[in-house]
A protein has these predicted regions:
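Conserved alpha-helical substructure of the radical SAM core
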Residues: 1-110
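Conserved residues at the C-terminal ends of beta-strands
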Residues: 25, 60, 114, 189, ...
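A general structural signal marking secondary-structure boundaries and capping sites
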Residues: 26, 68, 130, 144-147, ...
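Short, solvent-exposed turn/loop segments enriched in Gly/Ser/Thr/Pro and often Arg
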Residues: 62, 192, 325
Length: 347
């Protein structure tokens, strides 16, 4: 059996933006008795490194940098063990060159800043905070300046959630990120149902109106835009990836169930293989082979549990293989890489 490629670790559930695609910002950050300690998280990383010394640890949460006491021990340990470490941040915490330099010298192997558009109003609207565009762009510029000063080779990326509000401007968006900002890459993540619990004032489930209003409807135009951009900017996008993106949006369009969010019928066929390469560990030390809670989970309590999970989970994998949930389009779990070149992590 191949070892897991990625270990996704939740380190918090709080955020300082108010993204329309996520409800984490509605929660107050609390420390619960069930949460694993920094030391327990370190033990999990150490065991993962024995499973795959060439693996990658992905720091997850809301805005992970809001908990530096948990963030930096992970990046330092990954550097010590020779593991790759990946981190996506919204840019609000990267406010000066000193911090940018620290990210490049002590932080993850690659740094990704969330950026939803080259148009400030579109980014700010989807992120829920006026001025968040300026903070994200400033973070990218600071990181690039620090990289030049340090003569570092740390990749610096932008990542966007693509939806009705921004996909038609993808050409201009690529131009802005690659030629104006001069970041190394623009990663595309496709809008999925809203993360977190959607409840009305009475505490009852409510419709996923943002997903319904903003998931891309015209999958054929989207496909043509992707073809145009990969040729113009020499992106080397894999044709199978572009077809998967078209299939995902075509499925949502045909199902006519976007308003039901995660209760939708799903894609035409399975497009995810998270179960073959990922382990996700939440704040309570509960491990899964994907982010969905509909499949069995495993509590990591002692040394050896992570290894046992990976090698004994074939019955769970068999349950997961036919899964067609909309989250299969996520860059973290999607079966097909965006680019033809095989990278350590999908883009």
């Amino acid at each position: 059996m191949q070892p897991p490629k990625f270990l996704f670790l939740d380190i918090n559930l709080q955020c300082n933006l108010k993204c329309k695609t996520c409800m984490y910002w509605t929660r107050e950050e609390v420390v619960l008795p069930t949460h694993i300690s920094i030391e327990q998280r370190s033990d999990i990383i150490a065991e993962f490194s024995t499973l795959n010394p060439q693996g990658a640890v992905v720091i997850c949460g809301g805005e992970a940098l809001m908990n530096p006491e948990r963030y930096w021990p992970i990046t330092r340990q990954c550097r010590s063990l020779g593991l790759r470490c990946l981190s996506v941040m919204n840019g609000t915490m990267v406010t000066d060159l000193r911090f940018a330099r620290r990210l490049l010298t002590e932080g993850p192997s690659e740094v990704t800043i969330s950026l939803n558009s080259y148009i400030p109003e579109v980014h700010d609207s989807t992120r829920g905070v006026t001025g968040s565009f300026d903070m994200a762009v400033n973070a990218i510029r600071l990181l690039l300046q620090a990289r030049k000063e340090l003569n570092s080779n740390t990749p610096i990326y932008a990542m966007s959630v693509m939806c009705e509000q921004n996909y038609k401007d993808l050409d201009q968006f690529y131009d802005f990120v690659l030629n104006d900002l001069k970041a190394d890459k623009l990663k595309l993540n496709w809008l999925q149902p809203t993360f977190g619990t959607l409840l009305d004032r009475n505490g009852d489930p409510r419709p996923d109106k943002f997903y319904d209003n903003n998931v891309i409807r015209d999958h054929e135009t989207l496909f043509e835009i992707l073809k145009h951009c990969t040729e113009k900017y020499q992106l080397n996008l894999d044709p199978e990836y572009m077809e998967t993106v078209r299939k995902y949006h075509r499925s949502v369009f045909k199902n006519e169930d976007a308003v039901t969010g995660w209760d939708g019928h799903g894609t035409e066929d399975a497009i995810c293989n998270s179960f073959d390469r990922n382990i996700m560990v939440n704040m309570d030390g509960v491990a899964r082979l994907c982010f969905s809670d509909q499949f069995p989970s495993f509590k990591i309590s002692r040394s050896g549990d992570l290894t046992h999970l990976w090698h004994s989970a074939e019955p769970v994998r068999n349950l997961m293989r036919p899964c067609r949930q909309y989250c299969g389009i996520s860059h973290s779990v999607r079966r097909v890489n965006a680019t033809k070149k095989i990278d350590m992590i999908q883009v």
